[in-house]
């Protein structure tokens, strides 16, 4: 594809999509909020440590590829939003699946259904499979089905926004992190708490800006 993403660009794009779909009231995202989202320990594979300089560079790359833009909301803090849905004509179910693949790498049908639930509910595995088929049968495919490895019961699916998947090498890379497992109840609670903390931080920052503006009237 013409818009090949590197690892940091993929993480930033995935986070922008995720926050738009899970916490739209705090979207678009500031650079600080986006860095926090990129470095979450839940809903991420692998876990990454990206400072704001790295995130800003990834945003520059996405803006050059016309996949992200500076939001024109008139606020004092610059905020960013993604353009993937508009650029590729993706519907919410497709966007949710692509987002999970960007954030966690190759996954099975069952894993995708469970993990995408927070963004878009799927009634059954057939619904997820239908979305994956649409993404694979596009003029320029966005998803591919990986060969099933020995010892695995199910095949996994991977996004192609980072270029062609080198099958065995890709599988080995993710196997090094350990096999994918379904999120436990504890993982779900941690994910929700982290999202609430991020949202509260954004709200505090907004209140501080209001206070600063108010003080400025008397200076």
UniProtKB/Swiss-Prot annotation:
SUPFAM superfamilies assigned: Winged helix' DNA-binding domain
A Pfam family that the UniProt record links to this protein: DUF480
Family as reported in the entry's similarity comment: Belongs to the UPF0502 family.
PANTHER family per the UniProt record, alphabetical: UPF0502 PROTEIN YCEH (PTHR38768:SF1)
Name of the featured protein: UPF0502 protein Ppro_2903
Naturally occurring in which organism (per UniProt): Pelobacter propionicus (strain DSM 2379 / NBRC 103807 / OttBd1)
Classification of source organism: Bacteria, Pseudomonadati, Thermodesulfobacteriota, Desulfuromonadia, Desulfuromonadales
